[in-house]
UniProtKB/Swiss-Prot annotation:
PANTHER family: LARGE RIBOSOMAL SUBUNIT PROTEIN EL39, RIBOSOMAL PROTEIN L39E. This is Large ribosomal subunit protein eL39. Pfam families: Ribosomal_L39. Keywords: Ribonucleoprotein, Ribosomal protein. Belongs to the eukaryotic ribosomal protein eL39 family. GO terms for biological process: translation. It comes from the Archaea. The lineage of its organism: Archaea, Thermoproteota, Thermoprotei, Thermoproteales, Thermoproteaceae. It comes from Caldivirga maquilingensis (strain ATCC 700844 / DSM 13496 / JCM 10307 / IC-167). SUPFAM superfamilies: Ribosomal protein L39e. The keyword Ribonucleoprotein applies. One of its GO terms (cellular component) is cytosolic large ribosomal subunit.
Length: 52
């Protein structure tokens, strides 16, 4: 991937990176452990982003 990226592309990459994590601990406490994992979790090797 090129070092120089357009701003919109960079923002989309940052957004994808932020959304690719487990829910915080306080969410589990608040929902009485009904929400324990993120169903939209993405692995960089298996699933590619449709950004191009």
């Amino acid at each position: 991937m090129a070092t120089h990226k357009p701003l919109g592309f960079k923002l989309r990459l940052a957004s994808a990176g932020k959304s690719n994590r487990n829910p915080p601990a306080w969410v589990m406490v608040k929902t009485d452990r009904k929400v324990t994992y993120n169903t939209k979790r993405r692995n960089w090797r298996r699933v590619k982003l449709k950004l191009g």
